[in-house]
Amino acid sequence: MFNWVKTAMLMAAITALFIVIGGMIGGRSGMMFALLIALGMNFFSYWFSDKMVLRMYNAQEVDETSAPQFYRMIRDLATRANLPMPRVYLIDEDQPNAFATGRNPEHAAVAATTGILRVLSEREMRGVMAHELSHVKHRDILISTISATMAGAISALANFAMFFGGRDENGRPANPIAGIAVALLAPIAGALIQMAISRAREFEADRGGAQISGDPQALASALDKIHRYANGIPFPTAEAHPATAQMMIMNPLAGGGIANLFSTHPSTEERIARLMEMARTGRFE
């Protein structure tokens, strides 16, 4: 229930941002047009944002025939978590990473890069995918996917206002300062993501994933490897769509600038420390 409230609040905040931008671009008529666009985007994001994100990453669906070991691993973990079998996707990227998407557990999908399959052992891979299924189980994936697509749309609209300017309700060119102000709304979109996708949720998914797999040490080892490789291997698609970075198990962006803006992940060191404490005590709290 809490995530439904959080999703509604996120949609309302983004709708308000669309209206503000519309007003700066086209006055009162721009506000009305932006409201209609926002309502359409909210509807689209709820029903289709998962498909959009998978298409952005050119994710290819696999099954037991095309990726037998990986597919069976997901099926086993989903059974352990008492979840429906999600759709399974692979992304042809060298950087090791993974994410989950979908509006609920009955319409969920998990995706992993080909790079992560090369880098991690089977045991570590189970830890990673259990983490993603924990996001599914706790219904984190709807707000993650909606915030990613809507924040991208906000940034695009803000950039449009910056470069093409706007008109007031009398048809006169808008104040150029307003265009600059609109452009500043792109960072606000990033801030919205940080508010909506709290770092506490990553800790919770680590804990839940450790419970599902029964092996917190495997996830800790996987996070250490992913962190080291992710810092040295670019992820062009994630860099082109930085609002989607918060969906990944590890921030796929290089340090600085945009990476800090969209940094919704807690430090890898702290995540590993918590997992190792779980392994030491046997308590998943």
From Swiss-Prot:
Cited Pfam families: Peptidase_M48 (PF01435)
Highest taxon of source: Bacteria
Disulfide bond positions: none
Gene3D superfamilies, sorted: Metalloproteases ('zincins'), catalytic domain (3.30.2010.10)
GO terms (BP aspect): proteolysis
Cellular location(s): Cell inner membrane
GO MF terms held by the record: metalloendopeptidase activity; zinc ion binding
Sites where the protein binds Zn(2+): H131, H135, E202
Annotated CDD domains: M48B_HtpX_like
Residues at the active site: E132
Its EC number(s): 3.4.24.-
Keywords assigned: Cell inner membrane, Cell membrane, Hydrolase, Membrane, Metal-binding, Metalloprotease, Protease, Transmembrane, Transmembrane helix, Zinc
The UniProt record lists the keyword Transmembrane helix: yes
InterPro entries assigned: HtpX_protease, Pept_M48_protease_HtpX, Peptidase_M48
Names of the cofactor(s): Zn(2+)
Annotated GO CC locations: plasma membrane
Residues spanning the membrane: 7-27, 29-49, 146-166, 177-197
EC top class, as a word: hydrolase
UniProt main location, coarse: membrane
Cofactor note: Binds 1 zinc ion per subunit.
Annotated protein name in UniProt: Protease HtpX homolog
The species this protein was found in: Paraburkholderia phymatum (strain DSM 17167 / CIP 108236 / LMG 21445 / STM815) (Burkholderia phymatum)
Gene encoding the protein: htpX
